[in-house]
Amino acid sequence: MANHFVTVKEFARTALPRLMEHLVFPNLIYKDFSDDFASMKGDTVQVRKPVVFSAREFDAAQGVSTSDIVESTVDVSLDKIATVDVGVEALQGATSMDDLTRLFVEPAAAALAQKINQDGMQLYQDVFNHVGTAGVTPATLDAFAQARKALNRQKAPVSGRAALWDPEADAAFTALDPIVHAEKCGSVQALREGAIGRVMGMDNYMSQAVCRHTAGSLAAASGDITVSGAHTAGGDALTLTGTTLTGTLKKGDLIDVAGGSFTVTHDAAVAEGKIVCRVAPALPALSGGEKVSLAGSHTANLCFHPMAFAFVTRPLPA
């Protein structure tokens, strides 16, 4: 009987389908693949953004007015490589490809998927819109309604919306009567599979990779935390003050001020009674003295349109 040597291609053919089965977040967002090789970790590639058009009322007298097709790009740093490393001796006990699949490929694919899901879910730190109460697990239909309202206000396209919930929120939702009794509209999936399904225009999924955010310790000894001094519109540096202000702000902390929501983009600490933090999106004009609200530690469940995020990959040279 001829010897059979397992090659890298055979591993890939077996592992990739199993990896895709375990992926959650990347399968719900925009994906950018290319055959162009990346030479090394940290390379920057340009990813095309969808073309945006503006519609107008047709005027027969003016005739057709063509719109320019402008393709814009965004730079993405390929700064993450997920890997599962196993010594050759650990694979030598396998006597067939089926053994290799059971002992190594399937567990490795699951581990890689968990790593990729967790890295993707860390993007919550860049999301500034938020609803609900920090530290309180969403457990009513109002959570869906408020998330839908936030997406509508941001003019997110209606089709393709999705939501990822942590196990606690998922358990609370699957016990809701309107979801349990969804069989009245022809579906028994919620009852038999424990699946939330599509609610209020969003496809809902559970993921153990949903992140828990630990907020910074910024606090004032008494009174409110307020904006310190005037700020011009368009800036990203927000200065806060308060009575005997102490503590820190962490990347991903949520700040509400002047009717807007912002996320902290870099860690910051109090110095000389004030704290200067970088935020997104750009600030409006502030006169100073505006009251600031800080969200506490919370679970970062996500509701989004697929075009809000992108999963970008490139092959590495052998």
Per-segment meaning from a language model:
Residues 274-318:
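Glycine- and charge-enriched low-complexity intrinsically disordered segments
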Residues 49, 258-259, 296:
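Conserved "cap/hinge" positions at secondary-structure junctions
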Residues 107-136, 217-224, 243, 301, ...:
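Signature of extracytoplasmic/envelope-associated structural regions
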Residues 47, 74-143, 152-168, 195-204:
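Long, contiguous amphipathic alpha-helices that act as assembly "spine/axial" helices in icosahedral shell
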Residues 172, 177-287:
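Autoprocessing Asn-cyclization modules and mimics
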Residues 1-74, 78:
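N-terminal "assembly arms/tails" that initiate or stabilize quaternary assembly
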Residues 31-36, 133-142, 146, 231, ...:
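Surface-exposed ligand/attachment interfaces on beta-rich extracellular proteins
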Residues 55-58, 86, 96, 172-175, ...:
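Short helix/loop capping segments that flank catalytic or ligand/cofactor-binding pockets
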